[in-house]
């Protein structure tokens, strides 16, 4: 397992690029990353205007904004137009989210295309195809982060979006992201009128090893943030573990009736490092 020290968003708010006012308003919500969507949420005839909306929003966003843009699947003409727009403007989003990824070569191609234009965004991949799942270690090796796309994967598998139906894919993502030290973000919740379902799902994916969660509605941000963002109590507990193991000269220590040792200290250091990285990049106090 690779220690995770990079800044990983804990909440990503998806907003269709259908209205400039809507996109600008979304920037006011307390999300770590504000994503403008050019893919599924934008009908084909509206995609050209959606690109204009994204370009205007990017060029007028504050420098501290952590903006992402989800592009159309490579191999489509819409993806080509997306790339031309992104590489010809004066501002590039912090994150590019790819859709329907199947092979590592697609990610390498996109990264090299941006680099040729002097652009170096972080590239997150929507994991929603069987091909990506079955080659996940190689796919994750060329990514900066993974985002679970449950709807398309469930449609391909012919199963409903349930915890048991999606568990194998989620576990594979967590293992791949841990191996390569990259972010792992859970799928959006589609049962918007059932907050108890959302709360349970957030806790379950946190326990599984996910770092963040996507959402399509700002009303979910408070619950996502309160559960997944670094909190003072967790950071304090991690600090106490590292101190206890250090005092035991790197061996086994007893802390509040619990045995802790080197592996616990390594996890605690990861918690402290990732919390510090998150605060430096995403905390609104640094905006």
Q: Which ranges hold each PLM region?
A:
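Expand to "…catalyze enediolate/carbanion chemistry for C-C bond making/breaking, isomerization
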Residues: 1-287
């Amino acid at each position: 397992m690779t220690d995770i020290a990079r800044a990983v968003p804990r909440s990503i708010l998806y907003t269709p690029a259908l209205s400039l006012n809507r996109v600008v308003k979304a920037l006011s919500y307390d999300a770590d990353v504000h994503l403008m969507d050019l893919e599924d949420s934008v009908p084909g005839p509206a995609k050209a205007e959606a690109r204009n909306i994204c370009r205007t929003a990017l060029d007028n966003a504050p420098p501290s904004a952590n903006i992402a843009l989800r592009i159309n699947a490579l191999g489509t003409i819409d993806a080509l137009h997306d790339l031309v727009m992104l590489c010809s403007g004066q501002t590039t989003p912090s994150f590019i989210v790819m859709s329907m990824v199947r092979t590592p070569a697609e990610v390498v191609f996109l990264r090299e295309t941006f680099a040729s234009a002097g652009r170096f965004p972080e590239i997150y991949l929507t994991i929603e195809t069987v091909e990506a799942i079955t080659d996940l270690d190689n796919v994750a090796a060329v990514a900066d982060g993974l985002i679970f796309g449950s709807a398309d994967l469930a449609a391909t598998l012919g199963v409903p979006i349930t915890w048991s139906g999606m568990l194998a894919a989620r576990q594979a993502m967590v293992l791949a992201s841990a191996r390569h030290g990259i972010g792992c973000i859970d799928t959006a919740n589609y049962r918007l009128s059932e907050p108890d379902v959302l709360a349970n799902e957030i806790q379950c994916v946190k326990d599984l090893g996910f770092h963040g969660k996507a959402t399509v509605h700002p009303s979910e941000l408070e619950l996502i943030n309160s559960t997944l963002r670094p909190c003072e109590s967790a950071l304090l507990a991690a600090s106490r573990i590292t101190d206890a193991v250090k005092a035991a000269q790197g061996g086994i220590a007893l802390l509040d009736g619990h045995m802790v040792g080197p592996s616990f200290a390594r996890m605690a250091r990861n918690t402290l490092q990732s919390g510090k990285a998150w605060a430096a990049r995403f905390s609104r106090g640094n905006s």
